[in-house]
Amino acid sequence: GGAGSCTGWPISQARGNYVARAAANFRFFADHARLATAEVLPMDSGHHAYTRFEPAGVVAAIAPWNFPLMLETWKIAPALAWGNTVVLKPAEDTILGRLAI
């Protein structure tokens, strides 16, 4: 248990900036998702170009063993924020705390 086992770092470092920065990744990408809008773009030829937001669907995220929490949130947060389902595959060497995310 505890912050150290969840991050793979000594508790003193995990309680510092590490977990807070990982949480900030979710906040950043949640705010970024408001850009997911449909638009009508006029073109010179009298036509219009239409954009449409659609999630990709299922996103596979493969995370390495080093710096696990931060690298996982960099992959998970944008995929979830833009409406996708995420399947996370942590490295076999990664601590078991990764399965809780």
Model-predicted regions and their roles:
Residues 1-47:
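N-terminal Rossmann-like NAD(P)+-binding subdomain of aldehyde/semialdehyde dehydrogenases
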Residues 38-101:
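Rossmann-like NAD(P) dinucleotide-binding subdomain of oxidoreductase/dehydrogenase enzymes
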